[in-house]
């Protein structure tokens, strides 16, 4: 009936049926409790059924359930944008909302690409990535992430990128310290940018 994510339908174990949640705990239909160690895929960072969040949602639903931000605006969206911009120390001046991380990555890929198209630098269309990175499961987000068992089958759909080793000493294939691993990645990046930028500088 339901196609659950990251599962093979013909060999997956039945999912655990959850009846309620509170704080960091999930409770199944038999009353057993489980720690939600992944925060339901990183979205319940304040715990489940937090009283302040529940009350804020109730208050908002009594006023306005939803309105698109294309030609419209509303106070909560503007207030949150203002608060977010305060913590950037003036580095940013606009907030673009997204409903999930993968879509946010897709938006930023498009923004970066469109910026250089609009400024006439149409050759600047190569994205770089670290080999062990993860940014989501949409096509663009997988393209700028590392190759894994979850996205390998979709390689033919992804756009080409330049990949560099992640400076992670715990899994460093060159057995280097953090300083040396970071320096090695920097050398790779510098070499790549020199290869890309030199022809532009000479033209």
Model regions and ranges:
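Short, acidic, Ser/Thr-enriched surface-loop or helix-capping motifs
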Residues: 28-29
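Glycine-rich loop-to-alpha-helix module at the N-terminal edge of alpha/beta enzyme cores
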Residues: 6, 33-122, 126-128, 135-136
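PLP-dependent aminotransferase-class I/II
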Residues: 133-202
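Conserved beta-strand and immediately adjacent loop positions that scaffold enzyme active sites
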Residues: 23-25, 94, 126, 178
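Active-site-adjacent loop/helix segments that line or gate small-molecule/cofactor pockets in enzymes
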Residues: 1-25, 39, 63
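A generic secondary-structure signal marking the coil-to-beta-strand transition
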Residues: 14, 22-23, 33, 94, ...
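Solvent-exposed alpha-helices and their adjacent loops that cap or buttress functional pockets
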Residues: 17-19, 87-90, 119-121, 154-157, ...
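Electropositive phosphate-/nucleotide-binding environments in soluble metabolic enzymes
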Residues: 16-20, 47, 51, 74, ...
């Amino acid at each position: 009936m339901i196609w659950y994510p990251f599962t093979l339908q013909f060999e997956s174990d039945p999912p655990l049926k959850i009846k309620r949640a509170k704080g960091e705990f999930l409770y199944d239909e038999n009353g057993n409790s489980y720690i939600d160690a992944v925060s339901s895929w990183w979205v319940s960072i304040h715990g489940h059924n937090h009283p302040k969040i529940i009350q804020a949602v109730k208050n908002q639903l009594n006023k306005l359930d939803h309105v698109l931000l294309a030609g419209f605006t509303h106070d909560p969206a503007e207030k949150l944008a203002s608060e977010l911009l305060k913590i950037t120390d003036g580095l940013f001046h606009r907030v673009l909302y997204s409903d999930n991380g993968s879509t946010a990555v897709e938006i930023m890929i498009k923004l970066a690409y469109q910026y250089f198209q609009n400024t006439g630098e149409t050759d600047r269309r190569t994205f770089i990535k670290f080999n062990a990175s993860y940014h989501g499961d949409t096509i663009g987000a997988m393209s700028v992430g590392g190759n894994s068992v979850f996205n390998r089958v979709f390689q033919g759909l992804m756009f080409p990128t330049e990949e560099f080793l992640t400076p992670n000493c715990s899994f460093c294939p060159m057995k280097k310290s953090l300083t040396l691993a970071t320096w090695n990645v920097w050398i790779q990046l510098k070499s790549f940018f020199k290869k890309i930028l030199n022809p532009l500088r000479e033209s």
